Amino acid sequence: MNVQEQGFPLDLGASFTEDAPRPPVPGEEGELVSTDSRPVNHSFCSGKGTSIKSETSTATPRRSDLDLGYEPEGSASPTPPYLRWAESLHSLLDDQDGISLFRTFLKQEGCADLLDFWFACSGFRKLEPCDSNEEKRLKLARAIYRKYILDSNGIVSRQTKPATKSFIKDCVMKQQIDPAMFDQAQTEIQSTMEENTYPSFLKSDIYLEYTRTGSESPKVCSDQSSGSGTGKGMSGYLPTLNEDEEWKCDQDADEDDGRDPLPPSRLTQKLLLETAAPRAPSSRRYNEGRELRYGSWREPVNPYYVNSGYALAPATSANDSEQQSLSSDADTLSLTDSSVDGIPPYRIRKQHRREMQESIQVNGRVPLPHIPRTYRMPKEIRVEPQKFAEELIHRLEAVQRTREAEEKLEERLKRVRMEEEGEDGEMPSGPMASHKLPSVPAWHHFPPRYVDMGCSGLRDAHEENPESILDEHVQRVMRTPGCQSPGPGHRSPDSGHVAKTAVLGGTASGHGKHVPKLGLKLDTAGLHHHRHVHHHVHHNSARPKEQMEAEVARRVQSSFSWGPETHGHAKPRSYSENAGTTLSAGDLAFGGKTSAPSKRNTKKAESGKNANAEVPSTTEDAEKNQKIMQWIIEGEKEISRHRKAGHGSSGLRKQQAHESSRPLSIERPGAVHPWVSAQLRNSVQPSHLFIQDPTMPPNPAPNPLTQLEEARRRLEEEEKRANKLPSKQRYVQAVMQRGRTCVRPACAPVLSVVPAVSDLELSETETKSQRKAGGGSAPPCDSIVVAYYFCGEPIPYRTLVRGRAVTLGQFKELLTKKGSYRYYFKKVSDEFDCGVVFEEVREDEAVLPVFEEKIIGKVEKVD
């Protein structure tokens, strides 16, 4: 039966047509049971017989492709098409009506080319790449490029990245047509639609009006403007009847007349509530395993839940009569032939599961094929070309300035070396002239840290270095309590030490027997004073002079193995005025503030201030040199008298014991010059008054017998003190002894933490050599070997501890890394087959077990 466009009779049975939608099945009131993509909307008369235009409705179940002409009840899709459009963009583009409605919306917004380009790319990709379609594919690619990509003012061109457009242009120009050449552009346009146009479409008036007129309305008769502007529109579903009432067409029409009509295109809260659930994600809408009971559309809904997407089901899924029956437990549900009263709720959950699976299939698919590696887009330039160019130019200019500065510094150093070599040739000639220091490379030939250390940080590094102050204090208190402390107050000023070294090198012509030693000292170190050699000869009188000199050379060269030029550097008075100039070690040995090269620099600096300045006469230098050499001669005489007198084997043993217990002046880290780094512990400055005041005569030479007696007394006191010291002080003393006996290389980096005991203790060979050198005068130290594995390390740490009974507290003092540890020590035990166990010791007063004359432990960190 066809739909009548004229007025219907008032008979209730005559107004019911066969193509009208049926009421929902009990238990599925919240679901819409229509999926027809081309619905038909039926208009009912108001009882006056006025003609109205009929419109298509989405709620009709009639389908022309079925055998019966309509879908059997219960077999319809769970949701209508216009509700599936809100699930994803692909659901919208898979439906013809959705495409048409979406295109209409895009035309209103002025961006319909986005949808056309998307479909053009999809059609181009579906063309098979065969020889017959090659020309067709080329023409289609050119057409798509010219219409959408080439036009820079078009919406597609503006939404496509420059790299993508250049890639498509290259493919078209080179005629390298590939099915995936537009895939990247299609992906970008699709992202634009999903982020901008598609959400706007779901909130637009055209979509809301479509869903309102095409679905069940909460009102019985909704006001709708027809084509002629007359008549009332009504949704396709039959009106809901209250209990104990009959439906009357006139009654509903009268009720509609009393209501305020709403404009069809107006976006109201009621329309948003009706479409809230379809627009919400399916994962939020449904909760598997939970029974949902939908409330009435008349119930107020909190806007917070509506806006967040957690709204209830659409208002069209509830009926007042059904809701009342559910609340009163009355068996008055509307039943059909295929429905069962009291349907169990598990069918609702099953339907929800089916909808979730369908949503996964729709939203989880990948519409675009995989892009091969050869066709991928080039990486996007993340920095703007102008900014990149500015930054590159700035860096290149900085590199250029650095190189120019290095070249200028190189030229200045070359000029300084040439001038110094020229003035060195004008030095006074004599027997000492043949012992001139060899030429050494300049500062810039070494790593920058040594250069900076030598040039800028050497002057006041000693005063500011706490390690040097601590070493001086410990050495004064614990090693030499009776001697004068080599503190900062006993160091000579800058104008003394280097100047006297230079004078010493230039005025030793009258004493030939001192020339080899003095020349050797100057050639090797350039900074050591002659008293070092005197002290060394005094304690080695039983050995030949050649052997002594060879040993001195070996010790000094080993301590300065990396080069003598980095041991010290004098800053001339004109340093700030002659920036960039640097003195070499040769100049340092022969010059200070009163030597020839320094005089030349001072003359350069003061030439602008006083042009008539005169160089000091050399007579004063000669007098000073004479006094120094006289002091050296007196010291040598004392040595010769001591050698002739002799003191027997006991005296020799005392000397050797004193030598082994008190390290040489070369090895002992004493006070260093203010402009020498604190790491140069080898350079010892004598504290004689004649260095501070050149006019004062030197001190008389010390008596060797007195020195030997003093050395023996100190050795005895040291042994007594060592036995009474606690373990921590003995550890500090052992570390200090190790630091004195082992010569550290110059300019070595200062340790920020105390190293491990095993790295600082003496090895067995060194201990044996010391005992042998001592001649057996000192009693052997009763000590025990302590070895421990620290935190699972494969190599143990080994050290010597005085005494046979070692407690856990003493053992903890050996560990330099403090923390929470557990301590296990190896001992003999018959408890297990292996015969040994690692026993845990926790008390600090507990004595550690001894295994094979050793204490073997394991230190494990507590997690």
Curated annotation (Swiss-Prot):
Residue ranges, compositional bias (Basic residues): 529-542
Domain DIX: 781-863
Residue ranges annotated as motif Tankyrase-binding motif: 20-29
Gene designation: Axin1
Covalent cross-link Glycyl lysine isopeptide (Lys-Gly) (interchain with G-Cter in SUMO) as placed by the record, residue numbers: 858, 861
Polar residues composition bias: residue spans: 34-61, 575-584
Region (Interaction with GSK3B) location: 348-432
Location in the cell: Cytoplasm; Nucleus; Cell membrane; Membrane
Lineage: Eukaryota, Metazoa, Chordata, Craniata, Vertebrata
The protein, known as: Axin-1
